[in-house]
Regions:
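Amphipathic alpha-helical assembly segments
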Residues: 1-192
């Protein structure tokens, strides 16, 4: 779980990478805890996850880091970590490999897969939206369970994840899409 060290580290990250005042950073930490509780996710797990992914936070954070904190909640609801969300986002921004994976998956699955929206969202640092856009393309748990090993691997490659992580996502897809919608309505206020 989160320790005082994690909290102190996060306060420093918020101030250094997002140019927040000490009070704004503290408010962001409090709001993140409230967001986690509101979504039935252990706040200490969210704070620890973000504290362990400082490079990802520095690279993709916007609006004081609110987008990454919401993505951390989304990840936990999917049974994932921020490192998985980073793999998805970074994979989308590797345009050549992302397009190749998209074409291969489309051929192997016999259906059109289009990650253009997900790539655009990732490029705009909308980590949460990019993840939701990828989830929308994966198909249902029922469809996933009918796939053979090669098809499952190609779908995992498409998402930039291991098959086990992908399996968690498709089994929680409805929850993920509902969560993404709910999170977009919840705001994390960083300014008192």
């Amino acid at each position: 779980g989160a320790t005082l060290t994690d909290s102190a580290k996060l306060l420093g990250i918020f101030k250094e990478t997002q140019n927040l005042t000490a009070q704004q950073a503290e408010n962001l930490l409090i709001s993140t805890t409230e967001l986690a509780v509101a979504n039935n996710v252990a706040p200490d797990k969210i704070l620890a996850d973000v504290a362990q992914n400082t490079e990802f936070f520095a690279k993709f954070a916007e609006d004081g880091g609110e987008n990454i904190l919401r993505a951390a909640v989304q990840a936990k609801k999917l049974g994932l970590e921020l490192t998985d969300i980073e793999k998805i986002t970074s994979g989308l921004l590797d345009f050549q490999n992302s397009l190749n994976a998209e074409i291969e998956a489309s051929v192997l699955l016999g259906r059109n897969i289009n990650l253009q929206k997900a790539r655009e969202l990732a490029l705009a640092n909308d980590v949460e939206g990019a993840t939701a856009a990828v989830v929308e393309q994966l198909g249902s748990a029922e469809e996933f369970n009918k796939l053979n090993a090669i098809q499952r691997q190609k779908l995992a490659d498409l998402a930039g994840l291991e098959v086990s992580a992908l399996s968690k996502i498709v089994n929680k897809e409805k929850e993920a899409l509902t969560l993404s919608s709910a999170l977009s309505k919840q705001q994390v206020d960083i300014i008192p």
